[in-house]
């Protein structure tokens, strides 16, 4: 099996991330190519005016931009002259200002009771349907066999009667 060159792999990974971005409508934050320092590296990003993926230089933002990202790290795309925020886990938004809170609440007693009742009713209705289908099928089968017997016995007798 032939292996793909590293540039093809990176291009395919980048295109996959942009396809994912289009599907879930999120902002793609450029990340460094594996093996490079995150302070000064190159990354593949899609330009707004150009549908192709381009390689850009990334550096940390200057010290006067320390407070730009509320919950994340500020990065500067040198070639595009734009700044982006690399958000911490759980934060989203252009400046990492939104906390994505996932709350797991225990189920209420009413919800559990309603679920149990609905499942119980579903099982009773299903059992009733199966029972009536079996009775209908049995009656139909016995009716057919009775008709066969009537057809056989209703004909003229084979032996003469004495």
Swiss-Prot record:
Extracellular side: 53-112
InterPro entries reported in the protein's UniProt record: EGF-like_dom
Sequence intervals crossing the membrane: 113-133
Cytoplasmic side: 134-162
One biological process term in Gene Ontology: response to peptide hormone
Residues in EGF-like domain copies: 57-97
Disulfide links within the chain: 61-74, 69-85, 87-96
Cellular component annotations (GO), alphabetically ordered: extracellular space; plasma membrane
Propeptide residue interval(s): 23-55, 102-162
UniProt keyword terms in alphabetical order: Angiogenesis, Cell membrane, Developmental protein, Differentiation, Disulfide bond, EGF-like domain, Glycoprotein, Growth factor, Membrane, Mitogen, Secreted, Signal, Transmembrane, Transmembrane helix
GO molecular function: epidermal growth factor receptor binding; growth factor activity; receptor ligand activity; transmembrane receptor protein tyrosine kinase activator activity
Role: Ligand of the EGF receptor/EGFR and ERBB4. Stimulates EGFR and ERBB4 tyrosine phosphorylation. Contributes to inflammation, wound healing, tissue repair, and oocyte maturation by regulating angiogenesis and vascular remodeling and by stimulating cell proliferation.
Subunit (UniProt): Interacts with EGFR and ERBB4.
Name assigned to this protein: Proepiregulin
Taxonomic source organism: Mus musculus
GN (gene name): Ereg
């Amino acid at each position: 099996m032939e292996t793909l060159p590293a540039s093809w792999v990176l291009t395919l990974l980048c295109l996959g991330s942009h396809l994912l971005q289009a599907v879930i409508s999120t902002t793609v934050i450029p990340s460094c190519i594996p093996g490079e320092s995150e302070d000064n590296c190159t990354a593949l990003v899609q330009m707004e005016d150009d549908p192709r993926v381009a390689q850009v230089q990334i550096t940390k933002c200057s010290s006067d931009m320390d407070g730009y990202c509320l919950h994340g790290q500020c990065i500067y795309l040198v070639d595009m002259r734009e700044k982006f925020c690399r958000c911490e886990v759980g934060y989203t938004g252009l400046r990492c200002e939104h906390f994505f809170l996932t709350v797991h609440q225990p189920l209420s007693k009413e919800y559990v009771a309603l679920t149990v009742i609905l499942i119980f009713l579903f099982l009773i209705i299903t059992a009733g349907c199966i029972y009536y289908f079996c009775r209908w099928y049995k009656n139909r089968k016995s009716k057919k066999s009775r008709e066969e017997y009537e057809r056989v016995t209703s004909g003229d007798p084979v032996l003469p009667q004495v």
